[in-house]
Each structure stands twice: as C-alpha cells, then as structure tokens.
Regions:
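Well-ordered beta-strand positions in beta-sheet-rich domains
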Residues: 7, 61-63, 110-112
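Bacterial Sec-dependent N-terminal signal peptides
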Residues: 1-24
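A cross-kingdom signal targeting lumenal/periplasmic-facing segments of multi-pass membrane
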Residues: 70-161
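Glycine-rich catalytic cores of cysteine/serine-nucleophile enzymes that process amide/ester linkages
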Residues: 27-106
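Intrinsic-disorder-associated interaction segments
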Residues: 2-5, 9, 116, 186, ...
Length: 330
C-alpha cells in the first residue's frame, strides 16, 4: 500500500515538474489521440478519449484527460441530474494512465497525429494553459462538450479548422440508436434512458455530431485528411469497440415479461374473486407517477439536451391497462 502511495506521489511530482519546466517541444516530440474501450459502469460504457504528449528528448510523456469529476462535490448527484456537473482537465504520466485501464481490462488505442512542429507546440502550450487552476474546469455536456469533443476541437482549431474524412459509420442513426448501441439494446440502463429521452433524441446525426462518442472520433480520425490532404493519423492501433451482449435474464424484456405475468395472475385472481385489488394499482402506479414527475422536472429544469416527454412513457400504463382488461372483460 505504501509503495503504491509513493509511486503515485512521484507520478504527481513528475507531472508538475514537466508542466512547469518544459517550454517548447523538441523535433522528436509527437502527440497522440488515445481512445479507451468501454467499461462496465454506465458512465464508462461509451469509452473515453485523451491526448498524449510525448517528447523523449525533454523527457515528457503525459496524458491529458478531460474526463475528471469528483463525487465528493457538494450536491454532486443533484447537479448531475440537472446537467450542471463540472468536469476538469487532468494530467497524469502516460504509464500511469495506461496502467489504470489495464487493471480494468480495457484496451487503449493510440493514433499518432500528423502535426508540424509548430502545431505540436501550440497544442502543448494550449493544454498547459488549460490545466491552470482557473481554466481546467468546464461545464460538462454529454452531447456537446465532453472528453471527446474537447480534444477534437482543440486539434481542429490548431490545424486550421478543416479536417476531411470519408468515414460514414452508421449513417442516418439517431442519438437514441447510438446510445442504445453502447448501453446495450436489452439493458435496463437503455430502457431507463429511452423513457427519459424525448423527440430530440430521434434526430439523425451528421458525421461531426457523432464525434462526442470516443469510438466515432477514433474511426473518424483514422481516415481523416488535413487541409493539405495529408493523412491526419500517421500511426494507429485503432480497433472498433466490442460491445458485450446482455444475458437474457438481465434484460429489460425479461423484467417486463415478469411484470406482465404478475399482472395477469392478479387479474385472474381478481376475476375469480369478483373483487378489484386496488393495492396492485397503488403498488405500480406510485413509481410511474414518480417517473412522470422526474421526466417533467428534467424537461423544464435540466440542461440535458435530449431529455423530454416521449411516447415511450405510455408503454407502462398501456401494458398495465391491457393486462388488467382480463378482469374488466367478462
């Protein structure tokens, strides 16, 4: 334990020293886009993006990561629900960054960018400036401003606001369909997200709008061309993500089937007894009313761009009503 603490302290001191002492990168330096495979937690299901700055001459090998957040922030969950979560830029030695993902069995793919010495140094200086205490925090937005969009727009700004890519990927897919792809079509997380998302989530995305997703950014950059029509990436280990499937017993469809079976049995019992069980209505009705209140609150008071009322919210009461018709129809 103490060994790990000493290693971590040494890594932090190394980062601080590198950021403070190095003014300009040498001609041997390179900058890479790092893309991390998805993890098991919901917030990690979409993967992650970071920038690596490596200069063997200075020597420097640091990874800049726009995905740092603090659970201990005052009222963190309240702010997260409202879409008012502040993330920040973090920096670690690359070996430490890689080690943390190896421990989670999550591959990290690297794309070395084709940049001039001036462009590399401009990005390096911009990252150093962004890491200043007064600059490192930003208001996170899952779709428009996250760990993937920040590196992309920084690169875009430095090389001249022009990147051409023939990557089409899943052309025509909507926000909802993409998120279902990463969360798993049959997971409870996807079912919950579907209920919270409104009509805005059903808009088809352009190639650039999809770049908030780390995998899409990785694949987009892999065949991208600079303004001078030279490849944007000169060396790459990029590989499409492998999304694990959901076991049938953990799927929301299985849970819904149990729910319907439960209602059918109660309806048959009520019909035999000639007596309506109001308790079952209360038992299932209160959670649904709470869900409507949550969606209503998020629709009017949340900064999340895709949240809103949608027809999928009607699935629960319609399913409930159709099942209870066993009692009503004689």
């Amino acid at each position: 334990m103490w060994y790990k603490i000493r290693i971590n302290i040494a890594a932090i001191l190394l980062c601080i020293g590198s950021l403070c002492s190095a003014q300009s990168l040498s001609d041997s330096a390179y900058i890479s886009l790092l893309t991390c495979a998805p993890g098991n937690e919901l917030y990690a299901r979409f993967g992650h993006t970071a920038l690596r700055v490596c200069d063997p001459v200075l020597p420097i090998d640091l990874t800049f990561n726009y995905g740092i957040f603090d659970f201990n922030t005052d009222h963190f969950y309240w702010k997260f629900v409202r879409g008012e979560t502040w993330y920040e830029l973090g920096v670690t030695p690359t070996w430490w960054f890689m080690k943390s993902y190896r421990e989670e069995h999550r591959p990290v793919y690297e794309q070395r960018l084709n940049l001039t010495a001036e462009e590399r140094d401009t990005i390096w200086q911009a990252l150093r400036k962004n890491y200043l205490p007064e600059n490192r925090k930003y208001l996170y937005n899952f779709v428009y401003d996250n760990c993937a969009t920040r590196p992309y727009y920084l690169i875009l700004h430095v090389i001249g606001d022009t990147i051409h890519s023939n990557y089409t990927g899943y052309t025509g897919l909507t926000y909802r369909q993409f998120i279902r792809h990463y969360t798993g079509a049959h997971t409870w997380a996807n079912a919950g997200i579907n209920l919270l998302f409104g009509s805005k989530a059903d808009q088809a995305m352009s190639s650039e709008q999809r770049l908030f997703l780390p995998e899409e950014l990785m694949l987009y950059m892999n065949i991208a061309l600079r303004r001078d029509w030279k490849p944007m990436v000169v060396q790459s280990t990029a590989t499409p993500f492998v999304i694990p499937s959901t076991p049938w017993y953990a799927s929301w469809e299985f849970g819904l089937s149990i729910y319907v079976l439960f209602l059918v049995l109660f309806s048959i019992r009520d019909r035999k007894r000639q007596k309506w069980s109001w308790g079952i209505e209360v038992f299932f009705g209160i959670p649904y009313v709470l869900l409507l209140l949550i969606v209503g609150f998020l629709t009017f008071f949340s900064c999340h761009p895709l949240v809103g009322f949608g027809w999928r919210l009607l699935i629960i009461p319609i399913t409930h009503l159709c099942t209870r018709l066993i009692y009503i129809i004689r």
